[in-house]
């Protein structure tokens, strides 16, 4: 097998991706598929960090839109990401993989607090390190958390797991004629509002030169393909 193109990655998993075909909760088949794929990547001596969202359980923006205090709604969303992180940790450990969950909000009974140097040490020891609770601050998305953690741990790429095989100029589910992009630069993403990630996250990636690969999570084996440098999905960079 060819050598991996990237040696340290951040995999961004949305809560919706963990829900699979459901609208709420966690799909065990999806969870186990992700775990198998991550183990496959780690066996190639790639260091894997994962940032999880919480939209399958609670979305802070949705709560705010219904009149809830935005900060409170966002903190609830951060707690939802911890639930997802623990579920993913369990799935990975059932595959025999060493893991650590690190939360931006301290809850020492269930996971470690996020400490940058400790996170890097876990990665160097071959442990899959799962970052939960976003940035720990309201008003920031888990996409921004993925960009921030990538910069902090000096990850070489962010793999954005989606339910579609890349970035399109329109929703491919609603518009079969939507055009798929194989490659974009950060300015395209920011100026055209293509939905890769929010503008704060995209700007952070641009400022720190962190490339993004948007790919289809539903096809098993795609995480490894992206790590090996195969042309899948959409590449966003300079």
UniProtKB/Swiss-Prot annotation:
Pathway: Pyrimidine metabolism; CTP biosynthesis via de novo pathway; UDP from UMP (UMPK route): step 1/1. ATP binds at residues 12-15, 55, 59, 168, 171. One of its GO terms (biological process) is UDP biosynthetic process. Its main location: cytoplasm. UMP binds at residues 54, 74, 135-142. The keyword Kinase applies. SUPFAM superfamilies: Carbamate kinase-like. Its EC number is 2.7.4.22. GO terms for molecular function: ATP binding; UMP kinase activity. Belongs to the UMP kinase family. Catalyzes the reversible phosphorylation of UMP to UDP. Homohexamer. This is Uridylate kinase.
